[in-house]
Swiss-Prot record:
The gene is pvdT. Belongs to the ABC transporter superfamily. Macrolide exporter (TC 3.A.1.122) family. Disruption phenotype: Mutant shows reduction of extracellular PVD levels and accumulates PVD in the periplasm. Mutant lacking PvdRT-OpmQ secretes PVD and can import ferri-PVD, but has an approximately 20-fold increase in the amount of PVD present in the periplasm. The pvdRT-opmQ deletion mutant also accumulates newly synthesized PVD in the periplasm. Mutant accumulates unwanted PVD-metal complexes. Was originally thought to be involved only in PVD recycling. It was later shown to be involved in the secretion of both newly synthesized PVD and recycled PVD. SMART domains: AAA. GO terms for cellular component: efflux pump complex; plasma membrane. CDD domains: ABC_MJ0796_LolCDE_FtsE. The keyword Lyase does not apply. The chain crosses the membrane at residues 292-312, 545-565, 598-618, 626-646. Induction: Expression is iron-regulated and under the tight control of the PVD-specific PvdS sigma factor. This is Pyoverdine export ATP-binding/permease protein PvdT. Coiled coil: none annotated. It is found in: Cell inner membrane. PROSITE patterns: ABC_TRANSPORTER_1 (PS00211), ABC_TRANSPORTER_2 (PS50893), MACB (PS51267).
Length: 663
């Protein structure tokens, strides 16, 4: 009957064994059939020499390690049946660890170290800060909240460790050699704190090799060679826990909370994400030289993609604008056969006259031209000289900026007059007025009567402004010796029906040339489409080349993250000991990879804009597009996350006790 009223133990071990080795290595059994029960309100000391198995027993009690065999029940739950998140809940909500080596995160302040369990518990920031400051003040560290571990003495670090253990309540304090690394005065202070916690109703499990320290406990369990050799439990166990213990530490209460609260607390992910961002920034800043080298790959990759695409888009827009400036209703006819094996045809003046009669045609302009030497004074200059009719300004949408264009009378009389392009004017006359001056074209004098408006390059192979327009008749008689045009420019009557006009011209030419297709027809719209396709292909190629450097940057992220995981293995163990789930660790390191990518991406965009500005000063066509910038940044972020996932997953899968033991 007495047993029926006995409270259910918080912790109950039955025949716990722990073995290491196997798989080709010698097997060592560290714990050999350990059985014990611990109730609410107990202050227990587990004492034993070094290597006796007491620390291994503590790791199993705190769910940092799993036994090889036997059963461990916590608050009536079989711990072996709990998944990793449920065991993390126990470490976060039920246990508080005080380690011999303090196990504080070096890059975090005292307050940030204390707050860590509360972050994983999803406690709001304001409440978290208040509670952490209150605990540190209670432990005499009110003036040390912003100090990092290396700025604290050993005793102060251990008090920070105790404050951290109490952050989420610290119902069960697991203290592993808490005085082992301290001087006698600091050790006495720590033991006084543990006595105080025990008197307040916390379960305190003290792991020590010092029998004088163990004597402070109400119950002493001696472990030797992995076995319990003595246990004072029968006489020393308190019969009635305090009111605080009744409220917080009864097994059935913790059992219910475990069943309800092992999932991620509401809102915890926000706190954890903010903490992950802050931690990532701290690590990046502390290792800023290494971070800068890693970021360099991402920066170069993003900048390359953005600049390459901007140059490609700028070139495309420039070419499209310049080609479109000549009109989208333009059709070109030449004597070049589309069949390279066929003989070259001749487009005659009769063909031109016949085309002009078609209803689908608005204007027809034969062109007889070529690259010739032009002289003014002692300046010789090569320019394209084209014999055209008076429809030139209208067909090509190319007005005269200075002077006038030649007339039908000039055409009929084969008058030697010339309208020069903007570039020719600059080269031959500089700032002087060219109107009325004479130039020599192939030693034939022509009087300049006008200057064409600046037009720009047509397609990159000829400079449209580097040309001279003269009457077609004068060009045929004085310069080229033939009335047959080099090619014909035709303006369709309707810009929306250019293809119909092209078909009508094709049918007419086939009839005039007796079914022989010894000519070639192209229209400006088709040329623009073809050029656009070419430019798109070029942009894609440039972007692909640049993307390779972005890929290299991603590999750099993976490399640095793998190195970070190796260097911060103990920190990962500390986070797990304070209640971090595997998902929390994964989120932490993925956030760091994302931070690297975000900072590198933003810096890459800034560098790209600077390079673009320099290129614009150098008269290079550059057109930044929001889609290219967002795309490059997104690719950098995705690349960082993809390459950061493997290191993050490796970190999340670390064994807590092995991580804590790493150097």
């Amino acid at each position: 009957m007495e047993n029926a009223t006995q409270p259910v133990p918080l912790i109950e071990l039955r025949d716990i064994r722990k073995r290491y080795g196997g798989n080709g290595t010698p097997e060592v059994e560290v714990l050999k059939g350990v059985s014990l029960s611990i109730h609410a309100g107990e202050f227990v000391a587990i004492v034993g020499a070094s290597g006796s198995g007491k620390s291994t027993l503590m790791n199993i009690l705190g769910c940092l390690d799993r036994p090889s065999s036997g059963s461990y029940h916590f608050a009536g739950h079989d711990v072996a049946e709990l998944d990793s998140d449920e065991q993390a809940w126990l470490r976060r909500e039920a246990f508080g660890f005080v380690f011999q080596g303090y196990h504080l995160i070096p890059s975090a302040s005292a307050q940030e170290n204390v707050e860590m369990p509360a972050i994983y518990a999803g406690i709001p920031a304001s409440e978290r800060h208040t509670r952490a400051r209150a605990l540190l003040e209670r432990l005499g560290l009110a003036e040390r909240t912003a100090n990092r571990p290396h700025q604290l003495s050993g005793g102060q670090q251990q008090r920070v460790s105790i404050a951290r253990a109490l952050m989420n309540g610290g119902h069960i304090i697991l203290a592993d050699e808490p005085t082992g690394a301290l001087d006698s005065h600091s050790g006495a202070e720590v033991m006084a704190l543990l006595d105080e916690l025990a008197s307040q109703g916390h379960v305190v499990i003290l792991i020590t090799h010092d029998r004088d320290v163990a004597a402070r406990a109400k119950r002493i369990i001696e472990v030797r060679d992995g076995e319990i050799v003595s246990d004072s439990a029968n006489d020393e166990r308190p019969a009635h826990p305090s009111a605080g213990v009744e409220r917080h530490l009864q097994a059935d209460d913790l059992s219910q909370r475990l069943a309800e609260g092992s999932s991620e607390p509401s809102g915890a992910w926000r706190a954890e994400l903010l903490e992950a961002v802050r931690a990532a920034w701290r690590v990046m800043w502390i290792n800023r030289f290494r971070t800068a080298l890693t970021l360099l790959g991402i920066i170069i990759g993003v900048a390359s993609v953005v600049v390459m695409l901007a140059v490609g888009e700028g070139s495309k827009r420039q070419v499209m604008a310049q080609m479109g400036a000549f009109g989208s209703n333009i059709i070109y006819l030449s004597g070049y056969s589309p069949n390279p094996r066929a003989p070259m045809g001749i487009v005659s003046s009769d063909d031109v006259a016949a085309i002009a009669t078609l209803p689908q045609v608005k204007k027809v302009m034969p062109v007889n031209g070529g690259e010739l030497v032009v002289r003014y004074g002692n300046i010789d200059y090569h320019a394209y000289v084209g014999g055209n009719n008076t429809d030139f300004p209208e067909i090509l949408n190319w007005p005269v900026a200075e002077g006038s264009y030649f007339t039908e009378r000039d055409e009929d009389a084969a008058t030697t007059v010339a309208v020069i392009g903007y570039k020719v004017r600059k080269k031959l006359f500089g700032s002087a007025n060219p109107i009325g001056r004479y130039i020599l074209i192939e030693n034939v004098p022509f009087q300049v009567i006008g200057v064409l408006a600046e037009k720009g390059s047509s397609s990159g192979d000829k400079d449209a402004d580097n040309r001279i327009a003269i009457p077609y008749s004068a060009a045929s008689i004085r310069l080229f010796g033939t009335r047959n045009p080099e090619y014909v420019i035709i303006a369709a009557a309707d810009a929306q029906r250019v293809h119909q006009a092209e078909r009508a011209i094709d049918q007419l030419m086939l009839r005039l040339h007796r079914g022989q297709r010894d000519y070639e027809l192209t229209n400006n719209a088709a040329m623009i489409q073809a050029e656009a396709k070419t430019q798109n292909t070029l942009s894609l190629m440039l972007g692909s080349i640049a993307a390779i450097s972005l890929l290299v940057g991603g590999i750099g992220v993976m490399n640095i993250m793998l190195m970070t995981v190796r260097e911060r293995t103990r920190e990962i163990g500390i986070r797990m000991a304070t209640g971090a789930r595997q998902g929390d660790i994964l989120r932490q390191f993925l956030t760091e990879a994302a931070m690297l990518s975000v900072v590198g991406g933003l810096a890459g965009i800034a560098l790209a804009l600077c390079i673009g500005g320099v290129l614009l000063l150098g008269q290079v066509a550059v057109a930044f597009s929001l889609s290219a910038i967002v795309g490059a940044f997104s690719c950098a972020l995705v690349t960082g996350l993809v390459f950061g996932f493997m290191p993050a997953r490796k970190a999340a899968q670390l064994d807590p006790v092995a991580a804590l033991a790493s150097q």
